[in-house]
Amino acid sequence: MTQATDSGFVQPYKGDPFVGHLSTPISDSDFTRAFIGNLPIYRPGLSPILRGLEVGMAHGYFIVGPWTKLGPLRDSAVANLGGLISTIALVLIATICLSAYGLVSFQGKSPEGADPLKTSEGWSQFTGGFFIGAMGGAVVAFFLLENFELVDSIFRGLFNS
């Protein structure tokens, strides 16, 4: 007769039901590890300001769309401008929150050789890069929305000739 301790049954991690881990077939796959490792916050060799710039560009760019299409001005002629202004306001709030996090989390001297993103100066650079990148991403998205017909005609001419 089989015992309840056979490996075919679900067992607690290391035999202790009060200790857990978050290892799943999805989170432990090579694809997931490579994908997460290539995100700018984890990519080796980037300075904090470049990390913030890349994260900010993505966030500024993709936040304009929901504000434009779902915001209170969605049915008006100035929906794109309303989306841009709302995005700028949200980016300002996010930048203030990032700055506050850096002020309370990285107080005092940082040890030599510490990860630059885990120091007060590094986090400040990350926050500055985030702000500049998010503003730039929002303006680019606004420009593309305002000139959609032009961009569409360029791509139609390029690919349908």
From Swiss-Prot:
SUPFAM superfamilies: Photosystem I reaction center subunit XI, PsaL
PANTHER family cross-referenced by the UniProt entry: PHOTOSYSTEM I REACTION CENTER SUBUNIT XI, CHLOROPLASTIC
Protein's UniProt name: Photosystem I reaction center subunit XI
A GO-annotated cellular component: photosystem I reaction center
Location(s) in or outside the cell: Cellular thylakoid membrane
Biological process annotations from GO: photosynthesis
Xref: HAMAP family: PSI_PsaL (MF_00447)
Membrane topology: Multi-pass membrane protein
Name of the encoding gene: psaL
Key word Membrane present: yes
Keywords tagged on the record: Membrane, Photosynthesis, Photosystem I, Thylakoid, Transmembrane, Transmembrane helix
Protein family membership: Belongs to the PsaL family.
Listed InterPro entries: PSI_PsaL, PSI_PsaL_sf, PSI_suXI
A Pfam family assignment: PsaL
Residue ranges of the TM segments: 84-104, 126-146
